[in-house]
Design a protein with these regions (language model features):
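Active-site-adjacent pocket-lining segments in enzyme domains
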Residues: 1-99
Length: 99
């Protein structure tokens, strides 16, 4: 699914608009591909599926191997097994995200 979404210009524009407005942008597993294609991860601390680690690094992201990484309004997680941490990270980020 992320592979299809990352090719949709409307999806990419939405992600860019959220990132620029400092609204929550969250991705788990291969979902980081969408943010990569939107060009919003440069200089952002992230995690994701080990299979996209090189893609994240090549896009300018700062890779961390952790269940969840929260960097301002960006939340990322590695895999479905990390879902509890991912949900806590989203709640944490939402507490600090401007409307």
């Amino acid at each position: 699914m992320p592979d299809k979404l990352r090719r949709d210009p409307k999806v990419l524009e939405l992600v860019r608009e959220f990132a620029e407005a400092e609204k929550l942008v969250a991705a788990i597993c291969h979902g980081g591909w969408i943010a990569i294609s939107a060009g919003v991860y440069r200089g952002v601390r992230v995690t994701g599926s080990l299979g996209i680690k090189d893609d994240l690094v090549n896009a300018g992201a700062i890779w961390e191997d952790a269940p969840v990484v929260v960097d301002r309004h960006f939340v990322s997680s590695r895999k479905p097994a990390d879902l509890p941490d991912f949900c806590r990270g989203i709640l944490s980020a939402m507490a600090g995200v401007r409307e």
